[in-house]
Curated annotation (Swiss-Prot):
Its main location: cytoplasm. It is found in: Cytoplasm. GO terms for cellular component: cytoplasm. HAMAP family: Urease_gamma. GO terms for biological process: urea catabolic process. Belongs to the urease gamma subunit family. It holds the Pfam family Urease_gamma. This is Urease subunit gamma.
Length: 100
């Protein structure tokens, strides 16, 4: 299988998000990389489904709460930026203050 660098990045995000999803389901608090992967994967999937950039920017703030992550993670994670592929092309989605 030959993947472009962007496809490899998406695969890495998905794999990390899968680990984060499983840990969250078991009641474990997510660390910084897991939280970023969890939010990023949800944004990528939403773009694939055809949701708008504005919708995804808002959606990204609803995925995790302070109770879902380790202490200090909300303060470290001030924004998440994901280059997502939409039906009409690739766009940058920025989620400001994703953990509230």
């Amino acid at each position: 299988m030959q993947l472009s660098p962007q496809e490899k990045d998406k695969l890495l995000i998905f794999t990390a998000a899968l680990v984060a999803e499983r840990r969250k389901a078991r009641g474990l608090k997510l660390n910084y990389p897991e939280a970023v992967a969890y939010i990023s994967a949800a944004i990528l999937e939403g773009a694939r489904e055809g949701r708008t950039v504005a919708d995804l920017m808002n959606y990204g703030t609803t995925l995790l709460t302070r109770d879902d992550v380790m202490e200090g993670v909300p303060e470290m994670l001030t924004e998440v930026q994901v280059e997502a592929t939409f039906p009409d092309g690739t766009k940058l989605v920025t989620v400001h203050t994703p953990i509230r």
